[in-house]
Amino acid sequence: MSEKLVEIKDLEISFGEGSKKFVAVKNANFFINKGETFSLVGESGSGKTTIGRAIIGLNDTSNGDIIFDGQKINGKKSREQAAELIRRIQMIFQDPAASLNERATVDYIISEGLYNHRLFKDEEERKEKVQNIIREVGLLAEHLTRYPHEFSGGQRQRIGIARALVMQPDFVIADEPISALDVSVRAQVLNLLKKFQKELGLTYLFIAHDLSVVRFISDRIAVIYKGVIVEVAETEELFNNPIHPYTQALLSAVPIPDPILERKKVLKVYDPSQHDYETDKPSMVEIRPGHYVWANQAELARYQKGLN
C-alpha cells in the first residue's frame, strides 16, 4: 500500500470578512502518495493555485487540515518547524520572469535557500552544489554569473527548477510551470521534471488548466471547479471514464491531433444549474475503486447507472 505524504482534509480557504468574505476553496479532500505526481486541474480562478499556496504556507486556511508527513502544517508553527517545511516543500512558479530577482545573479538566486538554511559546510561545498544542480537542469556553470534577463523563458524556468531542487525537497508544488513557455520548450521542461522525480524520488503537486498536458506527467488527477473538487481518479481512468459533467466538458475541449476526428468532435458545455443540492446535499463519493466524484444521492444513482 502506498504511503501518503500529503493529506488535505475538509480544507476551506477564504479571503475577507463579513459581507466581503469570499470562499475560494470549499471542502477540499484529497491525498498525495510518496513518489507520485498528483495533478490539480481547473480553469482560471478555480482555486487550484490557492490550494498550492496554502500547502506551502503562502495562503492562510479558514478551516480543515493540511497534513504533511503525518504532521498538521497549517496554522501556527514553531520557527524550527517552519524552517524545516521550507526546506522540504518547494515551489516552482508559473512565471519564471516574475519569480526570479532580476538584480541578482543566477548563482545567488540558486544559493539563497542554501544561505538561509546553512545547508553547506563551506564555500567550496556551496559552489559544488550550485554547479551540480545548474548542470543537471541543462545549463552551464558559466551561466551562474549572469542575470535572469539574459536568458530565454525556458532557461529561466530551468533556473527556477534548480532553485527549488538545490534544497533537496521531498515535495515540489509545480504551479503551471510550462504555461508561460513557448510550445517548443514545454516538453523539455516536463521531461526534466520527470527525470528528477525518477532520480530523486520526488513527489509532485502539478497545477494546470490543460488536461492534455497533465495526462503526460500525472499518476492521478483531481478536477476542481469554483473551489470544489468534483472528481479524483487515476489518469487513464479519468480520461476513459469521466463521470462529472464538468470533467466531461474539460475533456471535450482537449484538441485531437487528427483533423477528421477533430471536426467530428462534439464540444460539451458545463451548466452548473443542472445540480439540485437544495435538500439532497453532495459529498465526495467513491464510485469505482480509487475514483471519487462530487455528487448527491440522486446524481450518484444516475452516474452508477451510466457506468453499467
Swiss-Prot record:
It is found in: Cell membrane. The keyword ATP-binding applies. CDD domains: ABC_NikE_OppD_transporters. Keywords: ATP-binding, Cell membrane, Membrane, Nucleotide-binding, Peptide transport, Protein transport, Transport. Its main location: membrane. Gene3D superfamilies: P-loop containing nucleotide triphosphate hydrolases. SUPFAM superfamilies: P-loop containing nucleoside triphosphate hydrolases (SSF52540). GO terms for biological process: peptide transport; protein transport; transmembrane transport. InterPro entries: AAA+_ATPase, ABC_transp_ATP-bind, ABC_transporter-like_ATP-bd, ABC_transporter-like_CS, Oligopep_ABC_C, P-loop_NTPase. ATP binds at G42, E43, S44, G45, S46, G47, K48, T49. One of its GO terms (cellular component) is plasma membrane. One of its GO terms (molecular function) is ATP binding. Residues 6-251 form the ABC transporter domain. It comes from the Bacteria. Pfam families: ABC_tran, oligo_HPY. It is a peripheral membrane protein. Belongs to the ABC transporter superfamily. Part of the binding-protein-dependent transport system for oligopeptides. Probably responsible for energy coupling to the transport system. This is Oligopeptide transport ATP-binding protein AmiF. It comes from Streptococcus pneumoniae serotype 4 (strain ATCC BAA-334 / TIGR4).
